[in-house]
Amino acid sequence: VPFLSYSRYKEALKAECFRHLITARDVLKHEIWNYFNDRYGDIDVLSRNPVIAKGFTRLSGAFHAYGIDGPQFQKIRSIYQPLMEYYVADYGYANIFFIERDGSVIFSALREDFSGTDLFIGEYKDHHIAHIFKLALEDVSFEDYSWNDKVNDFTAYFAAPVFEAESLLGVIVIELPFSHLDTILTHKAGLGKTGEMYLVGEDGLMRSNSRFSVTPTILQKEVDTEATRDAFEGYVGAKIINGFRDMPVLSAYTPLNLNFINWALLVEMDEAEAFVAIQKAESLLKVIASVIGTITIGYIYFTRRAYKKAEEEHDILESEEQSEA
């Protein structure tokens, strides 16, 4: 019965470890959903704002008439600069860009990175911002993270077309720093010394930084495990696998299921740490079993010895009685 009770206790502890990781996974998934859906909402609202459409029209007219360095253009730019700077500061963007439908970058909120260039034929025609611009001419679009020397961070883009009535004016782009997503993912409370949360893109590369690496792992570390393969096939689950550090881990995984992102989310902890309570219980059980075994052997030994002594004494008494007779 005690061993049966321990077996049930062991299974209950394992189930509790997995429940903890699954809860962390589901909470994190919700937070990531909220972050990206909020940014999707931001770009959608900005693109529909009449003030933005008016800004496109006025900036475009001045740009083509006087050039980006002309005082007339700079005067109109100064009207929209404070508003865009507010959006950047308040929402934590890296930048906001206005791009005409012909590919001319006519506004940059914080820096002049691409201003005045042509994203169809200019020096940045193969840049990520050119790619997102071309996609966003049709609909709201997302461009995955890539390294940006200007801000010394990985950045991603959301972009949407801007219309005035039925006429396409161009595309508005918001640039997102990776630091926001990294803050969400580096939450370690309740995950012990070896637990971590991380994202993997469909190209197999991490979209986050591992707590076990002193150098960035985003877009550098390749992860191909049973859990990531399951997640990219659409499965949600939790199991013990061989992790990307080549050791057994408890892994709770899920696809993100965002329309514009095909990533896998994983929450993991080393099996050795997760089952430490079980290991302690097993060690204690071994000690108890050893003590019980020693006591049992001692009991049998002394019982047999006492029984043998009693038999010897009985034989002596019997012999004495026969002699007296």
Regions found by a protein language model. Give the residues of each.
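Cytosolic signal-transmission helices at domain junctions
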Residues: 11-19, 304-325
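Extracytoplasmic/periplasmic ligand-binding sensor regions of membrane-associated signaling proteins
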Residues: 79-81, 85-175, 238, 242-244
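Membrane-interface helix-start motif
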Residues: 10-13, 131, 181-185, 269-289
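Juxtamembrane extracytoplasmic/periplasmic/luminal helical "stalk" adjacent to the first N-terminal
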Residues: 1-78, 85-96, 141, 154-158, ...
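Short N-terminal helix-loop-first-beta-strand/juxtamembrane motif that initiates sensory/input modules
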Residues: 38-53, 85-105, 140, 186-206, ...
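Extreme N-terminal signal-anchor transmembrane helix of membrane signaling/transducer proteins, especially
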Residues: 1-11, 285-301
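Extracellular/periplasmic juxtamembrane segments that couple receptor/chemosensory ectodomains to their
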Residues: 162-170, 190, 198-203, 211-286
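PAS/LOV and related PAS-like sensory modules
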Residues: 20-27, 45, 190-191, 287, ...
